[in-house]
Curated annotation (Swiss-Prot):
Residues 178-223 are annotated as: Disordered. The gene is ygiB. Belongs to the UPF0441 family. Pfam families: DUF1190 (PF06693). This is UPF0441 protein YgiB.
Length: 223
């Protein structure tokens, strides 16, 4: 009798586990699937200007122009700002800098400092922009300004980078690439001036972090 009771007890535990673990396993799988969807990447196109975009997307000239103009406004708000033209040129190269609008994200005290030293403050020209679908499945397009240095000594030389210094490869318009959805999110407004070489340091740090993350991912996939 004791033996029979033991067998039945074990059978009960087995059946209980089967009934109760299956829904849990399904729930865990669902969570991972949802997380995967939330972190899914975005396919974007890289253009130098609205004309490049229009040539690649016949019939969408208006959308291309709107995205380009929005990217220019975003560049004014988020691009690295320098107190002097010389500081900007040292980072991005001759002919790659412009005076920034006084209202372009800078705090009043920093505007005053820049105006005292050079009459204005400076920012790099927008070298191109990323264009992709709006987050949330909207019918319009999202855009992100890109910058590039012509100074061979800069870590940003010949590369497309966003306002945070993240590197998106060679500064070659017309490319399509896959980026995290966060890449298209609005960047913080620039509220202080950058010291000479400061943006290049940010690009170098971001590149190191990207390489480290890629290496970690590869090792994980390989076991």
């Amino acid at each position: 009798m004791k033996r029979t009771k033991s067998i039945r007890h074990a059978s009960f535990r087995k059946n209980w586990s089967a009934r109760h673990l299956t829904p849990v396993a399904l729930a865990v799988a669902t969570v991972f699937m949802l997380a995967s969807c939330e972190k899914s990447d975005e396919t974007v196109s890289l253009y130098q200007n609205a004309d490049d975009c229009s040539a690649a997307n016949p019939g969408k000239s208006a959308e291309c122009t709107t995205a380009y103009n929005n990217a220019l406004k975003e560049a004014e708000r988020t691009a690295p700002k320098y107190a002097t033209r010389e500081d900007c040129v040292a980072e991005f190269g001759e002919g790659q800098c412009q005076q920034a609008p006084a209202q372009a994200g800078m705090a009043p005290e920093n505007q005053a400092q820049a105006q005292q030293s050079s009459g204005s403050f400076w920012m790099p020209l927008m070298a191109g922009y990323m264009m992709g679908r709006l987050m949330g499945g909207g019918a319009g397009f999202a855009q992100q300004p890109l910058f590039s240095s012509k100074n061979p000594a800069s870590p940003a030389y010949g590369k497309y980078t966003d306002a945070t210094g993240k590197n998106y490869g060679a500064a070659q318009p017309g490319r399509t690439m896959t980026v995290p959805k966060t890449a298209m999110a609005p960047k913080p407004a620039t509220t202080t001036t950058v010291t000479r070489g400061g943006f290049g340091e940010s690009v170098a740090k971001q590149s190191t972090m990207q390489r480290s993350a890629t290496g970690t991912s590869s090792r994980s996939m390989g076991g």
